[in-house]
Amino acid sequence: MNTAEVRKIVTRALSDATGAGWKVYSPRTLPVMPDQYPLVIVSVQSEHKVSQGRHVPQYTTTTTLRIDGRVLAYASGDDTESAAGVAWEEAEAMKEALERAIIGNPDVRMKFQQIADIRAHIGVDSEGEGHAGIVVLELDLEYYQGPEDFFPSEIVPLREVNVRGVHPPLHLHFD
């Protein structure tokens, strides 16, 4: 496993389990059109490897993954609730959905030794036409990397095995 695989695993899980659906992005694919909100951007912040001993490349690796969620809210005609308040509440709801999609997903949890740390930040940006609710999650995902991750195997896969017996003749073919 490596950091690109970590990002892909989490991106896939978020696409499947949040209200953002297919609108989960990796860096540099962020749309600018308002009709494409809510959206989620997944990027790798950093990676830290701690050696498990001398001579053999075995590491406990921690990848810090950053998940940026964005929602957009506009002021309604009545004064019952402000767009900034709606954006904040939607950002809070998105934070909960993002955490459930990762922590509650056994396919994600089984790939890692642990989710060592989660940091969450919520805010509202009111500079544009609407109010953007912003949630930032930073997750420290810990996993093992060993020789198999650094020295790829060049073994040719087994395609056919011929087995001969006395009665009856037997041929096995693997596809």
Feature annotation, model-predicted:
Residues M1-Y25, E47-D175:
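Charged, amphipathic alpha-helical segments and their flanking helix caps
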Residues D35-V50:
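A short, hydrophobic beta-strand-centered structural micro-motif
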Residues S26-P34:
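Short acidic low-complexity segments
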